């Protein structure tokens, strides 16, 4: 098991919190975000700044958006949506959708084509509505109470 550096992330998190909001964020954009070190199966950032790319799914206001983290490895295709960007293959982690502050946004990568974005949105809606594809309680690592 990989050791998580919560202390280093806490220092970065403090400076992230002090940043101004990023008002230039829009739906369909792919950005590097400061994800940090998270708990359990929550997706972590990587590299020395604990960052990773994510797709902006929905912008609520200047400070708050829904994002979908990306990865280059999909373990179970039921929980990931594949897309190609800049000649590379990525997977959107459907189970990791989250609300984040625009203070976490570091640098813009680009804009996902509308046809791909519409496909991703449709997949998110279908994923949320179709609960039988959720990981079964038997595969959960957490013991039953």
Predicted regions located by residue number:
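Compact nucleic-acid interaction/catalytic patches
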Residues: 43-87
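Preference for short coil/turn "hinge" residues that link or interrupt alpha-helices
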Residues: 18, 76, 102-105
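Short alpha-helix capping/helix-loop boundary micro-motifs
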Residues: 14-21
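Short, charged beta-turn/beta-strand-edge "cap" motif at the junction between a beta-strand
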Residues: 36-41
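C-terminal terminal-subdomain/extension
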Residues: 1-10, 23, 83-145
């Amino acid at each position: 098991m990989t050791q998580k550096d919560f202390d280093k992330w806490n220092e970065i998190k403090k400076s992230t919190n002090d940043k101004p909001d990023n008002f230039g964020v829009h739906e369909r954009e792919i950005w590097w975000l400061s994800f940090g070190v998270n708990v359990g199966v929550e997706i972590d950032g990587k590299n020395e700044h604990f960052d990773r790319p994510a797709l902006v799914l929905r912008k609520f206001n200047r400070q708050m958006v829904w994002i979908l983290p990306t990865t280059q490895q999909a373990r179970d295709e039921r929980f990931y949506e594949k897309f190609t960007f800049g000649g590379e293959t990525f997977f959107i982690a459907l189970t990791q959708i989250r609300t984040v502050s625009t203070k976490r946004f570091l640098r813009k990568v680009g804009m996902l084509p509308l046809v791909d974005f519409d496909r991703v949105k449709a997949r998110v809606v279908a994923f949320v509505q179709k609960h039988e594809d959720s990981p079964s309680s038997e595969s959960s690592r957490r013991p039953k109470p």
